[in-house]
């Protein structure tokens, strides 16, 4: 279950003396478990900002001001770390070339495991298991855009 109540987000100004940028204004909705939902709208409508709020990236890792409530399966996303939220919530960038963190397939698989504090030797083994599971053995060092 996803609950959003009166959610607003304002990005910090991009330049000194600039004005904050409103991205979301008073958004409210509920999504029942098992639902399949698409978010559509023109460029700049706040679709990505909304998805980042659902994943807890906003307000935890972005500069700006959030008001309202975002809960995913009873977890208030503004009161939990991104690491804790990542155990239950995933987020995929619109543009894979603008990915936030990882340079290789190996790094992409390792990232959430590292955030959960899993030992490097276990991560190394898990990468091989996951690549084998999806038929990508031998792609460990490949960069996602190649």
Ranges and model annotations:
Residues 55, 90, 97, 103-114, ...:
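Short helical segment in ABC ATPase nucleotide-binding domains corresponding to the A-loop/adjacent helical element
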Residues 143-146:
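Conserved ABC ATPase signature
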């Amino acid at each position: 279950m996803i609950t959003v109540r009166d959610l607003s987000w304002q990005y910090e100004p991009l330049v000194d003396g600039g004005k904050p940028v409103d991205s979301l204004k008073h958004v409210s909705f509920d999504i029942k478990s098992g639902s399949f939902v698409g978010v559509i709208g023109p460029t700049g409508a706040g679709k990505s900002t909304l998805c980042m709020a659902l994943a807890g990236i906003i307000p935890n890792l972005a500069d700006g001001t959030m008001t309202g409530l975002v809960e995913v399966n009873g977890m208030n996303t503004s009161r939990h770390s991104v690491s804790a939220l990542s155990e239950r919530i995933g987020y995929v960038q619109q543009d894979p070339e603008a990915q936030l963190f990882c340079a290789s397939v190996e790094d992409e698989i390792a990232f959430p495991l590292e955030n959960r504090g899993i030992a490097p030797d276990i991560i190394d083994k898990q990468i091989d298991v996951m690549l084998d599971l999806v038929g990508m053995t031998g792609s460990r060092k490949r960069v996602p855009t190649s």
